[in-house]
């Protein structure tokens, strides 16, 4: 065993520190198992920290990665970065730090895509809406990028655009989320201007990736030319912006909002398909449904036998996903969740439950780890 200084290579966002870290005077700075949640923490530990290096000795089994933990770490870091950019006080290493956030999202999807998708519905209190919505959109954008077989460079530009698309309306976005009032004329003007204003802020912060910036500029354009800010249509809209627009609109519709009724994932996908070639590209809307399924992961459903459960993973067909029943047919919460294959007659899906229906059940809050295991650990 030897004492070794912490280096930047030892740490990355979202990781659980595998050792106790001590300061120069031997005081404990952070305990083993602490999660790295920001680049500032990394800088602090590199500057001050040392640890007992047990390399070569028998190591304890490594804790499995958690997709949920990675996405929460991404939200924490992204919040600070977006605030800095919006205040024209971006750090000089902004691009690197945003790349690190994008990598956390990529890693989360790679660890468990089902958990990453489920967080869109089941992790809505983890960060302010204006930040969390960007993380959610980046998750869906990653799935679409993989389905479209985009290059690594295109996928990176799309993901970074999703993370920063609303940087010019952070304050208004959060206020709209919490308010039951209609938008004021001033707020409406900010919303209409935010694609162009966001591009300007990012340019001022040193971002020069044109594909990324074009994606943000066009993510509110519509297929029929009725969008904003440039009223472009069809092939005039960059392909990456079309993907971002679709991911953005799906995630916005399923989010809890004070000012409008929350849509079920099933209904949100149906609406996007009905809007084919008016607001969104019809082929891409169909692709989104293929990727998420008719019953996206995390959807609450009622089964034929009366049980209520959560869609936990895809089935052999989009109409027959696997479900974890969490409430019994008589309305009592189940102490042990029951795995149900909805191909079975009694376990078929009767209906998708709305947010209002769920509110009447008075069931205990669902911990994602109960359904998806350690890859959904906090």
Regions found by a protein language model. Give the residues of each.
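Terminal helices and disordered tails flanking the catalytic cores of nucleotide-processing hydrolases
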Residues: 1-102, 258, 262-378
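Residue-level signal for pocket-adjacent positions within structured domains
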Residues: 6, 16, 24-25, 31, ...
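A short alpha-helix capping/helix-coil boundary motif
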Residues: 19-22, 120-121, 177-179, 247, ...
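Alpha-helical scaffolding flanking metal-ion-dependent phosphate/phosphodiester catalytic sites
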Residues: 33, 137, 158-171, 186-200, ...
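Short helix/loop capping segments that flank catalytic or ligand/cofactor-binding pockets
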Residues: 39, 153, 254-255
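Juxtamembrane/interface motifs at transmembrane-helix termini
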Residues: 51, 176-179, 211, 233-235
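Acidic/His-rich, divalent-metal-binding segments that scaffold phosphate/diphosphate chemistry
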Residues: 58-192, 196-199, 203-209
């Amino acid at each position: 065993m030897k004492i070794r200084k912490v280096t930047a290579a030892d740490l990355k966002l979202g990781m659980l520190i595998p050792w106790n870290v001590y300061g120069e005077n031997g005081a404990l700075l952070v305990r083993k198992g602490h999660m790295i949640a920001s680049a500032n923490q990394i800088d602090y530990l590199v500057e001050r920290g040392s640890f007992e290096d047990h390399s070569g000795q028998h190591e304890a089994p490594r804790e499995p990665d958690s997709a949920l933990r990675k996405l929460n770490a991404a939200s924490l870091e992204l919040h600070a970065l977006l605030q800095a950019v919006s205040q024209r006080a971006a750090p000089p290493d902004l691009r690197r730090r945003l790349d690190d956030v994008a990598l956390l999202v990529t890693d989360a999807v790679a660890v468990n895509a089902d958990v990453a998708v489920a967080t869109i519905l089941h992790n809505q209190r983890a960060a302010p809406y204006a930040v969390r919505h960007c993380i959610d959109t980046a998750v869906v954008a990653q799935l679409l990028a993989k389905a479209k077989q985009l290059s690594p460079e295109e996928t990176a530009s799309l993901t970074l655009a999703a993370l920063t698309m609303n940087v010019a309306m952070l304050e208004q976005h959060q206020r709209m989320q919490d308010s039951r009032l209609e938008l004021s004329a001033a707020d409406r003007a900010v919303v209409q201007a935010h694609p162009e204003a966001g591009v300007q802020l990012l340019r001022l912060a040193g971002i020069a990736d044109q594909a990324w910036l074009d994606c943000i500029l066009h993510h509110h354009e519509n297929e029929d030319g009725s969008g904003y800010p440039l009223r472009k249509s069809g092939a005039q809209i960059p392909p990456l912006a079309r993907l971002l627009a679709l991911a953005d609109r799906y995630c916005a519709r399923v989010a809890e909002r004070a000012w409008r009724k929350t849509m079920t994932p099933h209904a949100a996908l149906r609406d996007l398909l009905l809007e084919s070639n008016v607001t969104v590209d019809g082929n891409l809307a169909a692709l989104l449904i293929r990727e998420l399924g008719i019953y996206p992961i995390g959807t609450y459903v009622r089964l034929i036998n009366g049980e209520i459960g959560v869609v936990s993973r895809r089935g052999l067909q989009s109409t027959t996903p696997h479900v974890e029943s969490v409430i019994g047919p008589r309305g009592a919460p189940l102490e042990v969740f029951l795995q149900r294959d909805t191909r079975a007659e009694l376990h078929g899906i009767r209906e998708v439950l709305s947010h209002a229906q769920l509110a009447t059940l008075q069931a205990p809050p669902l911990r994602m780890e109960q359904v998806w295991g350690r890859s959904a650990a906090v």
